[in-house]
């Protein structure tokens, strides 16, 4: 039964899902029309909101590009390749490979979402090289499914913003919060840990059960990571390019920075810190600046989709939050609609569902928090719902629909060498399963 459902889902996605870039363009037009109709703003005003937002994610675009490039370059280092290949020999069957890659991606995403995306993709490539008969699209989809738990983990932007406190917190929560809420009440709350535990057990089993009868096997030779060859050094400048000493000096400087950072801030893993770790670990593993740059040049081919498409999603976000003369925006109207249907018991679930819907159009935890936080937290407080519960419901909604949002799949797909159509059929079933788990946890455990 599940195989038939999976096959139908994969067929429908491959038949009707447009390419990620076309998807972003169509989404832009849908939001444009919806915002004009719901807020009464004309085309010139919406074009202004779109244009004002279009370049708002430039820094984030660079971060995403760097995490893909540095992570992939690190994975191409000889020592890392050998480690991944040894781990990839552990599974003795395609099903075991599916389970293992899901668990690795889940663990990585719980630690840091960027790390989870990269390590899941590179490990999927390693498994496809080693395990005969494994379905490569399902393997990559399984790696992506691990991303589902990121907002319940250490890099979750919403719980971390609650823990930071300050004037920004009061503004972002519509005045519902004036003091910080520690991660003990969010990330380490019992309901959050139970939701994560159920997903950690359930997702690997679901992915294992979705194995097709006729797997799409990729030629392992196509996934081999080319290793840079040594080039004879005849001049002083050429020998300098291939100097291990220069690389080690920069790595030592980075280690000193990391020591001070973690001593002062604890295990605080920001996106910039993760990128820095990938970059200097890659430089160390490749040995010389010249070899590392050749690995970077090979890895940089996968960022085209990120560079072109992220500005379109920034423009969509601009239209979602662009308000008319009386302060009404499409994002606010979507959120208000869910609020009016809520009771004290159902509010966390409806907050989760509304966040999942808004996330399709505003695929950024920070952007979504800016749209929904000032509306949802005061509404929840009026119904007697704890603010940390409302915040985590929004966080889980943001993480939930990422599984069907090509925006977040682009880094992983760039490393894996697949298109969104190849994995989204499997991701749809992960969406349904995880939605039931998360909604159930929020309803019965909060």
Predicted regions located by residue number:
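Hydrophobic core segments of alpha-helical transmembrane domains in multi-pass membrane transport
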Residues: 23-37, 64-72, 105-106, 144-154, ...
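Hydrophobic alpha-helical transmembrane segments of multi-pass integral membrane proteins
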Residues: 90-123, 310-324, 335-378, 383
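Membrane-interfacial loop-to-helix junctions in multi-pass transporters
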Residues: 19, 55-61, 88-100, 130-139, ...
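Core transmembrane alpha-helical segments of multi-pass membrane transporters/permeases
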Residues: 16, 20-29, 50-78, 266-328
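Membrane-core helix-loop-helix motifs of multi-pass transport proteins
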Residues: 124-217, 408-441
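Long, contiguous bundles of hydrophobic transmembrane helices that form the permeation core
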Residues: 2-11, 168-295
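Alpha-helical transmembrane segments of multi-pass membrane proteins
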Residues: 94-109, 133-157, 161, 176-180, ...
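N-terminal alpha-helical transmembrane segments of multi-pass membrane transport
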Residues: 1-120, 124-149, 153, 209-226, ...
